[in-house]
């Protein structure tokens, strides 16, 4: 029903009308007394089922069609010095959005230009780094937090110079299209984060096999309808934010939850939906970029932190590229990597690496500089699952907007066999939180990535301003080793060659599970990739273990120890 607010702003009168009809239908049920659950469920189920063929195609179109310019016209045509423009978006506008826009307006022109240029140049470099071309592509989707319009306006101009017309759709709304993390478009600060958490599984009211089949059928027809627009789409350019106050959810007894059967239906829908999308927008033909900036909520030193973030986002990528290559040269001689924590961190984990057939031409690690993931600072691989064993433990880590306390995941042959945290009083609630927020409702997941972050500059800034728990995973993953559960970084693109700056091919693009993709894609992918970082302060050692049993320390006592990497300290 709350979607009617957006529909009113966008003059979508038919959509407002059908929601009002639903409201009246439900209201009438209460006129004769309190209806039963089944009686209430029926109109909700048939509303979603009947109008899915209206709501879902619209969402597909608005993420592909630049002529739907409701948000873009506000950004490009408004007087950004008059902050009343923010209220034209139809989103909740808090003091955060007002303060952000006010701050952006006060920045020097060259500073905002530098932010926009770094963002759009990262997008361009992303295509170049993967050997792809955006020639023939005509559109790019911009996703961002409301308040950054001055930067986004410049980014629109930059993308147009590249021959790409920006699509700026709002984050999805309505139960049929809504994502758990509502950041797949332009969006504002949630009015109530507990409310968002409570309603994350409202689809439990109507999700069954028949609806799953209907939604997949409609999705296929929608992409077929808009296949010409899909064929010229180059991929998303994302501006993330950080600095919000920590959020610890409370499990409300009245909130909906998915049954085990519904969880399986949702996962199977996600897998098949990805296959449909990839058929019309092949991952081998697109790219992306992500950059992050702080929000005023981060505290009194917001302005200083903002300037430091710009510095972090524009570090000398050549320096990091060369140091990271030294690390890769050593890691490529290893068969395993061992990671151990210190102090209260109980991490004791061995990651198995793939065997290189031609070491002079191949590498196990990608040398990641500032292109698709800004800022610079990591080397990463897809571990071999067999032989990857041990405990991953982090005392405190933010994943999305949730702070996990004493997170533990134990791996056997690369698969998570147990997991827990200390957020709630009962073990059942703790396991459920990890399953929902990290494993995305899968019973278990493989380790899809192992990486070593090298951005000690960001780490120093985090310590100096006391914001270690505020940085988003985009930056946090560069501040220590990190591990991802779920798909590899190369899902749906394993067969697309990737080369490091030294000319060697990064060949560790699949694992034993994603290798099933050609015979059975449904068993090869999970539709999720969740990063978990161990901060340097909790890290003791990362050592490369050679096939003959000898080892070389990459990090010792939380500091870089490999000769040639000392500058990172």
Model features per residue range: what roles?
Residues 382-441:
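Long, well-ordered mid-to-C-terminal structural blocks that present hydrophobic/aromatic surfaces
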Residues 502-569:
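Extended hydrophobic packing segments that form well-structured cores
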Residues 147, 244-246, 295, 344, ...:
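Short, glycine-/Ser/Thr-/acidic-enriched flexible segments
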Residues 332, 400-403, 443, 476:
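Short solvent-exposed loop/turn micro-motifs enriched in small/polar/acidic residues
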Residues 387-389, 404-406, 413, 445-449, ...:
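Active-site lining segments that contact anionic ligands and/or coordinate catalytic metals
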Residues 418-490, 494:
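Dual-mode signal for accessory low-complexity, basic/Gly-rich regions
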Residues 143, 291, 340-342, 354, ...:
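Generic beta-strand/beta-sheet core signal
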């Amino acid at each position: 029903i709350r979607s009617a607010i957006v529909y009113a702003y966008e003059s979508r009168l038919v959509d407002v009308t059908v929601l009002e009809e639903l409201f009246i239908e439900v209201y009438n049920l209460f006129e004769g007394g309190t209806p039963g659950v089944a009686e209430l469920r029926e109109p909700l189920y048939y509303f979603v089922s009947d109008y899915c063929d209206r709501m879902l195609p619209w969402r597909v179109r608005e993420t592909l069609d630049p002529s739907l310019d409701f948000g873009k016209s506000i950004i490009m045509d408004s007087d950004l010095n008059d902050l009343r423009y923010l209220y034209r978006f139809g989103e909740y506008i808090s003091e955060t959005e007002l303060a952000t826009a006010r701050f952006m307006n006060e920045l020097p022109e060259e500073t905002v230009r530098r932010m926009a240029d770094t963002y759009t140049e990262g997008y361009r470099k992303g295509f170049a780094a993967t050997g792809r071309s955006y020639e023939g592509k005509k559109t790019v989707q911009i996703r961002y937090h409301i308040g950054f319009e001055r930067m986004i306006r410049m980014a629109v101009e930059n993308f147009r110079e590249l021959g790409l017309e920006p699509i700026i759709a709002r984050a999805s709304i309505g139960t049929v299209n809504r994502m758990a993390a509502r950041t797949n478009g332009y969006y504002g600060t949630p009015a109530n984060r507990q409310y968002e958490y409570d309603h994350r599984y409202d689809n439990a009211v109507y999700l069954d096999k028949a609806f799953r089949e209907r939604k997949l059928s409609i999705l296929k027809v929608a992409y077929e309808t808009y296949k010409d627009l899909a064929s010229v789409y180059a991929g998303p350019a994302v501006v993330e934010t950080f600095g919000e106050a920590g959020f610890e959810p409370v499990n409300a007894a009245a909130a909906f939850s998915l049954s085990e059967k519904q969880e399986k239906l949702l996962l199977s829908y996600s897998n098949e939906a990805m296959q449909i999308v990839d058929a019309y927008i092949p991952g081998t033909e697109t790219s992306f970029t992500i950059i992050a900036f702080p929000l005023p909520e981060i505290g009194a030193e917001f302005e200083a932190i903002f300037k430091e973030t710009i510095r972090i986002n524009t570090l000398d990528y050549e320096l990091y590229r060369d140091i990271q290559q030294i690390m890769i040269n050593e890691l490529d001689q290893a068969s395993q990597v061992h990671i151990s924590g210190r102090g209260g961190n109980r991490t004791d984990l061995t990651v198995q690496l793939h065997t290189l057939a031609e070491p002079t031409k191949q590498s196990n690690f990608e040398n990641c500089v500032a292109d698709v993931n800004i800022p610079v600072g990591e080397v990463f691989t897809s571990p071999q699952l067999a032989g990857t064993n041990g405990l991953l433990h982090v005392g405190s880590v933010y994943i999305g907007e949730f702070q996990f306390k004493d997170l533990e995941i134990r791996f056997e042959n690369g698969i998570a066999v147990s997991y827990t945290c200390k957020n709630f009083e009962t073990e059942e609630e703790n396991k459920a939180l990890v399953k929902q927020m990290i494993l995305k409702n899968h019973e278990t997941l493989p380790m899809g990535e192992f990486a070593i972050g090298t951005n000690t500059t960001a780490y120093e800034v985090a310590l100096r301003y006391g914001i270690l728990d505020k940085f988003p995973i985009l930056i946090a993953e560069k501040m220590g080793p990190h591990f991802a559960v779920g798909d590899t970084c190369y899902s749906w693109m394993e067969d697309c060659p990737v080369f490091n700056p030294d000319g060697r091919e990064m060949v560790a693009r699949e694992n034993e599970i994603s290798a099933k993709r050609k015979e059975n894609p449904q068993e090869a992918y999970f539709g999720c990739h969740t990063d978990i970082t161990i901060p340097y302060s909790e890290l003791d050692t990362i050592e490369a273990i050679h096939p003959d049993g000898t080892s070389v320390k990459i990090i010792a006592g939380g500091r870089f120890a490999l000769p040639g990497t000392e500058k990172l300290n």
